[in-house]
Amino acid sequence: MAEAKTTRLNKVLREFNISLDRAVEYLTSKGYEIDARPTTKISGEIYEVLSDEFETDKSKKVASKEVGEERKKEKEELRKEIEEKRKADEEKKEEAVSSRAKLEGPKTVGKIDLDKKPGEKSKEKEAEAPKEKEKEKETPAKEPVKKAEESKPTEKPAEKVEEKEDKPKEEKKAEPKKEEAKPQEAKAEKTKSEEPKSEETKSEETTEGGESEEKESDRIETKYTKLNGPNFTGKKIDLSQFKKPVKKKEEKKEDDKKDKDRRKKRRRRISKDVKGGGGNNQRGGAKKGGRTRSKPITKEEPTEEEVQKQVRETLEKLQGKSSKGKGAKYRRQKRDEHRQRSADDLAQQESDDKILKVTEFVTVSEVATMMDVQVTQIISACMSLGMMVTMNQRLDAETLTIVAEEFDYEVEFTTADVEETVEEVEENPEDLVTRAPIVTVMGHVDHGKTSLLDYVRKENVIAGESGGITQHIGAYGVKLEGGQKIAFLDTPGHEAFTAMRARGAQVTDIAIIVIAADDDVMPQTKEAISHAQAAGVPIIFAINKSDLPTANPEKIKEKLAAMNLLVEDWGGKIQSHDISAKTGAGVKELLEKVLLEAEILELKANPKKLAKGTVVEAFLDKGRGYIATILVQAGTLKIGDYVLAGRNSGKIKAMHDERGHEVKEAGPSTPVSILGLDGAPQAGDTFKVMEDEREAKDIAARRTQLQREQNVRTQRHITLDEIGRRIALGDFKELNIILKGDVDGSVEALTDSFQKLSTEEIQVNIIHKGVGAITESDVLLASASDAVIIGFNVRPAGNARQVADKEEIDIRTYSIIYDAINDLKDAMEGMLSPELKEEITGTAEIRETFKISKIGTIAGCMVTSGTIYRSAGVRLIRDGVVVYTGELSSLKRFKDDVREVKKGYDCGMQVKNYNDIREGDVIEAFREVEVKKTLKSK
């Protein structure tokens, strides 16, 4: 069997960023024919062809992703820059507030009291001059000192000239500050007299006079100014000011004009500088009033110690530290650990909820229950994949994986346990030998599959029973005249055996599709072809019954060509041959084509390693135990080997071929029956020979537990919505069934068929199914759950029949699947409540009315059609309108009461509780008849 590395087409399309039609069109132009479906598997060679052509599309997709990532990075960087700017602005605001807090110190210092000593203050001022230039915001502290120094007129003009040359606007800033400082100083020191104020005005006049002289002089005067010079000239200026009052008036006039200019400018400066700057904010506060300005600053601004303490506490909170001691720290750590653990558990639970742990062949309804979605969503997902499924149809592993991916779920199968625990041994190419091909015979029911195998076995003159088993897969080994061996698998053709056909296609190397020449390409034939194509095995068509007069092989080939399956006769690649399984015509040539196909496949296997293969069937043989029919695919199986098969394990005690002959060992491509398993494995399970018995038991136990968990998850509990639906329906019933069969494949087929019979009014529940005879425990379970026991090719064992009679449990046994399905369908129809259908029995015309006291109105009538019955209901019709509906209280002919009156006779009748009867009215008699309901599928 060829199991090449393949890739799904939809993954390749997403990788190269191309459409399905584009890929299929390009591959067709290159000579590669593939199905135009997203789920089609493509080989590595086709992948390379697509990669060479569409690598540019892939690179464009990658480039677009990179561009998108770069844009994301740019947005993130821009966001960080904005965040940093915002933080920087906040820090500047904090610095501004802190600087305003520091300015309060110089404002409250009482240096104005030192005006009595102008000489000492001038020396201090000269030493502090460099610092004042660095900090312009401290100018209010300089101004009172300058006002007191009346004996230094030449020094200050020199300094102001320098400022005027460098920054002309600084002078305008400094002058308003002199006036603003006065109200602040007056409020800070209440003991001040009015005399210093007059001196300050005089000092301002002298400074203004100095400024007028500066304007006339050049910048050269700044170079000649010395610190020692102003000490001598300051005294003379004071004397001249006192002697010349005329000059004061002129200077005052100039000061008034300049004060007006300053006020105008100050208003403008306030409007501009309110936005920022410590000095401007300070000036605005002085304008409003020092009292209102100082209070919020003292309240808002903490001390340096408080700031540092707050910073330390914040850092400790961020670092998870605490100054409360080790106990609080330990409790906080425990809370954090518990919170983190809870978050991890929640994340793990969410991820686990997205993983479906299932076995293969789960029904659509079970998958919907596990994923908590509507069944219709699963069906629509399958339809998008080109599959028509029903809610009770089973999905194989491949389809289940694809459907789960559509709903963002992952699927884990039980076979993964073996793959994890059992290491695959690398095979030595020298040990590989040619093995016999495994051929599966598939087709529609009654098209001659088993008849073909019967003839093949009879042709080889091999003693034994004919393999006429049609209810499950039969495995046979055939040796031809030339010494070649072929292993045949016979699959059933009934629609209920979908899963068994799928397993047969997965195990096989070559598929023979049998089609009757006098019939058509039936649905099961199409299904078998699709299974073979999905498994990737070559197909050979055997057109059977070609010896019949009604046979038309060309019609079959035409239908196959319409399905895009061209046989060699019509120029295609698929082999076909006309045969007759009854006469044997063409069978030999068909086998030769099978051997030719096997040679092309170059089938090889290693007989020296531990055996592995597939379980074909399993059943319980009374007296011997569980027997499994298996097909060895690699290695050699021997008596005494410990085998793990699905959820069961055991040591092989005996091996037999299909005719009951004992076999010591079985090589590759050999079907045998083994005895020794502890249970009946499911058909399709893989088996492996294990070296360690304990390891095999552990894996089997894990699989059993997983299957039990899956059964619990897929068991639907009744909900309020379902209860409401049943109440609204009014007549809802359930049919519980316990199903026992001879082989696992037949049990599964019956389970699917029975569940498909469920309708809105009757729900079929398979509460238990198994392989083997009907036991007492089955009867007791049926008694407890009010169920019916159905046996397929099995009978009650021991006292089961007596217990069933005592408990009044119905046991039905069948040997043909059609009979079981039809009987169950009839039973379900019998459970349905009959429908009431109205039937009109006759009509009568009122010719005359008679009114009798104490009785009422009597109608004299003539029956015009049908029969009027005494027990029937009646309608009184007047002018084509129903006036009253009721029943008769009496029906008489002449004076005698009668049960019925037929057409053409007259009679008298009285309508119960109604007397408004007139001549010409029509009385219509009717009665309700119960009609049997039929099943309506969902």
Curated annotation (Swiss-Prot):
G2: annotated span: 468-472
Location of region: G3: 490-493
Entry superkingdom: Bacteria
Record domain tr-type G: where: 434-602
Annotated segments matching region Disordered: 57-350
Function in brief: One of the essential components for the initiation of protein synthesis. Protects formylmethionyl-tRNA from spontaneous hydrolysis and promotes its binding to the 30S ribosomal subunits. Also involved in the hydrolysis of GTP during the formation of the 70S ribosomal complex.
Name of this protein: Translation initiation factor IF-2
Gene name linked to the record: infB
